[in-house]
Amino acid sequence: RSLSLNSKNINLFILKESQKIKNVDLLIGFDSIFKKENKLKKIIINSQENEIKNLLKFIRTYKINIPALYLENSIKKGKIIYDLLIYINEDQSKRIEITGKIKNTELNILKKKIFKDINFDFNYRAKNLQITDLRLKYRNIDFTSKDIQANIKKNLITIKADIENKINLDLLSEIFPHNLKEYFNEKIVFSSSSNFEITFNDKFKIRDYDLKSEIIFNDTNLNLKEINLKKYIKNFDKKIFLDEGKMNLIINKKNKTQLKFKSTYMLDKKDNPKILEIDYAKENDLEKFEIKTDLNSSKIELEQLNFYKNKNKDLFLDLIITKNKNIYEINSLKLFNDNDLFKLKNIKFDKNFKIQDFSLFEAKYYNKENFFNSILISKNKNTIDLIAKNFDLGLNIEKNLKSTNKESFLKLFENLNAIINFDIKLAKIDEEHDLKNLVGRSKIQNNKVIKANLSAKFDEINTFTYNRDQIDGKIVTVIYSDIAKPFVKKFNFIKGFEGGKLDFTSTEINQNISKSELRIYNFKLHDMPALTKLLSLASLQGIADLATGEGIRFNEFDMFFENSKNLIKINEIYALGPAISILMEGYVEKKKLVSLRGSLVPATTINKTIAKIPLLGSILVGDKAGEGVFGVSFKIKGPPKNLDTTVNPIKTLTPRFITRTLEKIKKSK
C-alpha cells in the first residue's frame, strides 16, 4: 500500500537551471508514514517539451557529468520530452527507467560531422537504451532505423543498429578508402541497408566499430577517364554502363575493409549486359583486388602478341592485384576462352608502374593470321627462359628491320638485367617460311639488349643467324639468312621477290636513329607493279614483259638507310643486273607515304656500244641510230597501296651512277 502525492505544471530548479515538468507523482509507503520513516517507493516525472541543452545543464548542476558536458557542447539545438520512473528499493537502491522523444535535433561531433533533423523515440532500462523510429539527415541524405540498441557498461557505450538510407558519393567516400567522385557522377544516389555496431568511451571517443552495408544501384555510368584502356580495348570510350549492381561493404576498427561488388556492365548501351565482379579487401596498408569479368562485348587487341578478339566472341578475365602503400603487384592474371589462354604471375611494379620483377608468362593462342602460338616465359632471379613449341616472329622481325624502337617492350621494366635463353621449336617468319630449332641467348643490361647470339635452320641446307654485340661503344646487329625472301618482304616497297641470300647490318647511332646496310645477292623480281609500270613508262616493254614473266635477275642489291621511329630514310639503293641497273634514294613514312626517285639504265655496261648488245639492242636503241632510250630518271610517290610513277628520259649518266657501276664491275672481276 502507498500514498501518492501529485503536482502538475511545475518548474523544477537546481540552482539556476530548471526543467518544465508536466506532472510529478511521489509514491510513499503507507506503513512508513506511521513509522515516521516517510520512505519513497517510486518517483514519476512526466516532462513538458524542454530544450535538450537545458536538460544537460540541469544534470551537470546536480552532478558533474563528463558525457553530459560533451553532449551539451555537441548539440546545437533540439527538443526532448521524457518520462522518468525511479523505483526505490527497501535498501534504498534505485532502478531507473526513462522513455521519451527527441525532436528536431542537430548534433555536431568533433566539429566535423553534422547530423540534422534527428527524431526518435527512446526507452532506457537497466543500462540498456532502445531507440526506435529514428530519422535523421547527414550530408543531405535521409537515414532511418526501426531499432537501435545501446548498452552502457562502466565507461563504455555499445550501440547496435539497422539503418536504411540513401547514400551519395560524399558519404561513400568517407567510408571507402578511394575518391569515388573520380569514377561516378557526383549527383548519383545509392540505396543502402546497413548493420553496425560501435563502442564509445565516456568521452564519446570511438573504441571499436563494425559496419556491414549493402548498397544497391541501377543505370549508373562508371567514368574511367584516367585509365588508358583504349590501347587494349578498342571499343572502350572512357566509361562503362552499370546496371543491377550491388556492393556489400564491411568495415571495422581493426583497419579491415571488405567490399564485394557485382554488376552487369556494357561498353555501349546497345550491347548485351555482361557480368563484372570485384572483391576488395584492405588490412592496414595492404589492399587486394580480385576481378572477374566477361569480355565478350569488348574488342581486344594485344599488339605485341599480334592478338585480336572481335566483339561477340568469348573471352574471360580473372585478375588478382595487391597494393602495399603505392606499390602494386599482379599476383595472377588469366585471360582465356576455349581456344586462347594468357597467364601472368607475380608481376611486381614500382611506384611509376614499371615492372620490377615477374615469375611467369604463358600464352597459348591463335593470332591475327590464325597461327597457333605456344609460349612459356619463366624467370628465376636473373635468368629468363623462353620456351616455345610455336611462335610467330614475323611482326618482331619487321619491327627489328624497320624501326629504331626495337626494344619497346623493355620500356615496361624498371631496370631489367638478365640473361634470356631461347628454345623455339618452330618460329614462323611469314606464310611460306618457318625457322626450326631457333636457339641461343641474349644479354640485357639496364633495359637494353647488348648481346645476342641466335641460330636456326630453314631446312637441312639453309640457315639463319642473328648476332648483336657492342663494337666501338655502339650496338651492332647482324642478320644473315640463306633465304632472303621472308625478310625482304617486310619492306613494303619491295615486291615480287624470289631467291637470294640476305646480309643485314644495323648500327645504333643513338636512341632515336640507326644506320643500316641491306645486301641481297642473286635474286629475281617479278610481278612487281611499281617496277613494271616504270619500265612500261620508259618504253622498255621487252624488259617489262620479263618483270611480269620469269622475272628480272639482279646480281646484287645494296640498300643504305636510316631508321627513326616512323621513318625510313633511304640514302641509296643500288641494284645491278644483266638487264637493268637502278640507283635511287628517298624515304618511307610508316603506313603513310612512299617517296623514291632515281635513275634506271637498261644495261650492265655503261658505254657507247649499248646498241650492239644482242637481243636488248633492238629493245633499247631501236632500228635506227640515235633512237631508243639510253636511260630514264623516275619518281615513285604515294601511299603504299596507290603509288604514282613518273619518268623522264636522260641522255647522260651521273658520275655517281657510273662510279657505283664501275665499283661493282671491278669486284665481279
Where is each model-derived feature located?
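Membrane-proximal interfacial segments on either side of biological membranes
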Residues: 1-10, 22-568, 573, 577-669
